[in-house]
Each structure stands twice: as C-alpha cells, then as structure tokens.
Amino acid sequence: MKLPVVAIIGRPNVGKSTLVNRIAGDQQAIVFDQPGITRDRTYQPAFWCDRDFQIVDTGGLVFNDDSEFLPLIREQALIALAEASVAIFVVDGQGGITAGDREIAAWLRQQNVPILLAVNKCESVEQGILQATEFWELAIGEPFPISAIHGSGTGELLDAVIKYLPPAAEIPENEEIKVAIIGRPNVGKSSLLNALTGQQRAIVSPISGTTRDSIDTLIEREGQVYRLIDTAGIRRKKNVDYGAEFFSINRAFKAIRRSDVVLFVIDVLDGVTEQDLKLAGRIIEEGRAVVLVVNKWDAVEKDTYTINTYTKMLQDRLYFMDWAEMIFVSAMTGQRVTKILELVDIAAESHRRRVSTSVINDVIEEAVKWHNPPTTRGGKQGKLYYGTQVSSQPPTIALFVNDPQRFNDNYRRYIEGQFRQQLGFKGTPIRLIWRGKPAREVEKTVNRATKV
C-alpha cells in the first residue's frame, strides 16, 4: 500500500526544499540561494510519531506569469495536492505577506485538501509569534511559526500533520528495485518516466535541461516495487555553470550510486556520443546493472534491416558494455516501454546473484581445459588455482593464481566471458580480482574451497 503524501506548497524561495530536507532528514531536495530551483515535484520518505509518510516538494508557484515552466509547475502542484492527505503552505515570515501569497492562499482554499500554514524563517520564539500573527489575514488557519533551517517549531507542525494522515496500514514487505534514469540532456528521460508511470509525473519540455532534481517515483508491477529516479541530464563539465545545474549533475551521479539498475537512455538520432561513452564508463565504475534504452525509435525510417544496423552501430561504440541488454523504444508513443521493466528484473537478479564456490570452480576447470593460461616469454605459465565469489552488487569473484602478471588482458576477458556464458549475469558488470597465492598455501585451501 502506498504511503500517505504530505505536499509542500508555496511561492519561490520561501524555504520549501529546506523544510523537506528538515522533515525527511536528508539533503535530497536541492537548496541553493536562487529562486525557482525546484521544478518537478520530488518525493522523500519521512517519519514522525510512529507514522511513515512521503513528503513531496513542489516548484515555486507564480500565478501572474506564464513564461518558461511556470504553468507546468502549477500543474505539478495541482497533481501533488490531488494525491496528498494534507498540504503545508510555506510563507516567508521575514518578508511578510506578498501578493503572491494571497493568490496562492485563494487558490488553496478552492482545493479539496486540508491546509496547514507554516510561517518560515522565524529564527526566535518571540520573533516568530509576532511574524506569524500577520498571516492570519490569509484565512488559511492557525499559522505555525517555524525555522526550517534550524528546526524550531517543526515538531508542532508535524504533530498537526499526522492528525490528517489516514490510519496506518500494514505495508507488505517487498524489496524494491531502485532504477536510475540516466542520460544526456533532452534524450527523453522524463518522457520515459511518464510513460513508465502512466501519468504526467515529471515536467516534460523540449527545452534541454528541464529536470533539475533527482526525483523518485514508486510504481508496482506484478507484485514488484520499483523506485524510479529521474535525473538531470549530464553535460560536459566545461558546459556546466556553478549553481543549480552543478548540484543537479552531482545529484545525478549520486543517483547512479544509490541505484540497482541504470536505464541508460540514448537518443537514436544522435547515436552514441563522446559524452555517452564517458557516462557509460562512470556507470561501470560504480558497478551498476544497466539496460540500454535507445529512445526516439519512432523518428527513424525503417526497413527490414534497420534494427540490425542500429544494433551493430551502437554495440560497436559500446563494445565494453556488450553484456547490457538493449531495447529500442519510443517514450513518446509508448512503443516497447512496458518491456523495459522485464529487462530491469533480469539485470537486477543478475546484479545481486550469488554463486557457490563449487559452481565457480566448475566453470574455471572447464575454461582452463579448453584454453590453458598463457606462458610468459621466460617460459613461466600462469596457474589458476580456484575462485570464490566475495560479494554481489555487482558480482565480484576473487581468482587465486600463482602470479597475476602472467595473465594478460585477453585471457582475463576469456575467463570473464566463460563466467557469463556458463552463469548468465545478463545486464550486470562482473568484477574479477586476480590474487597471487603461493602454491603451498593453495594446497591448504583449495580442497576446502571447492567443497563450499
């Protein structure tokens, strides 16, 4: 069952994201001294007085301006209110009531959701009482003086919040799969997210760089829960200005690290760019499972051999990621989008799989039988004694040999290929650790290892 939602509403730069971070206890929403940083609605898990819920941050509301993304932000706020059990209307206690506050208050009174009024930036109790009194004028209800940055008053606010949450219900335990949607700007990441969730979840615009936050969405398919993380497009460093975009890209890299599977989105019209190659290297470096999602397939003129031609072209560029499943989709039309989660399941299973030592050594024995380890120019041959899996996510196998330097790159790739051929590991990198071990020590451990 989905957790109840608490929406945060207000005009730009009143401290909404700071309040979200205070309640959620994590620095997830971007906080930067520039109005209008949050565009999408972003969800974070929160807990208060034995109650779990989700706190949703929304973009700054402006009603007298239809430029840029402002109409889309209003639409996102309306969606957040529709799914919320209660909303917190945040105002700036230091700046006092503005025309924008009055417009938002009038709009909120028309919505069918309870509203709590949080007067932020009240940095002392005495000051807060005086500042909050002015906001009775908005006719929203009792104003709660708070300091989101220091935490004062937020406990009383949350006490009021949980009174509006529905009764706690048991949530069935189900290990979620965390899926980061990663790619260059404007390759269709947010459109893909919307296609997967079936609703207008993230702001979609033809303007490059619309998504600034890493935003989480929970969806369920056939009993499996997925946490979808949409992120800002990743640009070359020289094209990034210090500020909100810098923090967004940093957040995208963090999203890769906290994911189980990365949907690596590529624009089929652009092919694999140099920036894509660097991004692919970053994903592998973090050891994440991958599904290659080739988007905008609807824009390609096709014949019988088109998909084979494009597959070979992309595989040639991403040869070092040949273990990743590839799927051609159109986020715009929904073509093949539903099959993406099937590939995510396969990649996630491979990513967390553990294989017994006996099975690993069966693979090694068979591999060595077909292709002996190389011999150095000095006539010294490499010996591969045994192996054991030391960790998962990604699968990591320690191989004990007489001298790691006797195993060249070709043979190492051969051994990795044998593990993939015999054990699968579709969609995930695997790491092989080559460890030197004297023969006398091997005699003490090899028999024990092969019986595990």
Swiss-Prot record:
GTP 2 binds at residues 183-190, 230-234, 295-298. GO terms for molecular function: GTP binding; ribosome binding. Gene3D superfamilies: 3.30.300.20, P-loop containing nucleotide triphosphate hydrolases. GTP 1 binds at residues 10-17, 57-61, 120-123. PROSITE patterns: G_ENGA. Residues 353-438 form the KH-like domain. SUPFAM superfamilies: P-loop containing nucleoside triphosphate hydrolases (SSF52540). Associates with the 50S ribosomal subunit. NCBIfam families: GTPase_EngA, small_GTP. This is GTPase Der. It comes from Microcystis aeruginosa (strain NIES-843 / IAM M-2473).
